C-alpha cells in the first residue's frame, strides 16, 4: 500500500549524467548505461521516503522523478546507494540539492564513499546504515 515503483529514471538536471559501466557484446557491441536503474517510493502522511539501488541515474534525478510521479514535493527520507565517490562538483551540487529540498533523513549505503558521506554530513546529518537497521515510515 502506498508504494510506487518508478521504472526508468529520466535525466532531469545538468550535473548528473549516466556513464557507461561497461560494454555489452552480443550481435554487436554497445555501452551499458544501466537504463534499468530505478527506485521504490513510499508515500506516507508526512511525504515521500525513497529506496534506491545504486543510483546510476543520479540520486537527484531519482528524487525529482519521484516528486513528479507521486505529485508530492516533501521528501521525508532517502536510503540506498547514491553513486557518489569523489569530492567533486557533482557532490557539491547534490548536497545543495539535498539542502534546498529540506530532506530530513539521509541513509547513504553502498555506492557512496566514506569521503562523500563525511562531506554530506558537514551540511546534513547522515544516518549510519548496517545489518539489522529498522526504519519506521508512516
Feature map (PLM): residue ranges:
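Active-site-proximal loop/helix segment associated with metal-binding centers of metalloenzymes
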Residues: 1-45
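Residues at the C-termini of beta-strands that transition into short coil/loop
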Residues: 9, 130-131
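Short, charged, surface-exposed secondary-structure boundary motifs
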Residues: 16, 86-88, 135-138
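Cap/insert and terminal regions of metallo-dependent hydrolase folds
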Residues: 33-39, 43-50, 54-130
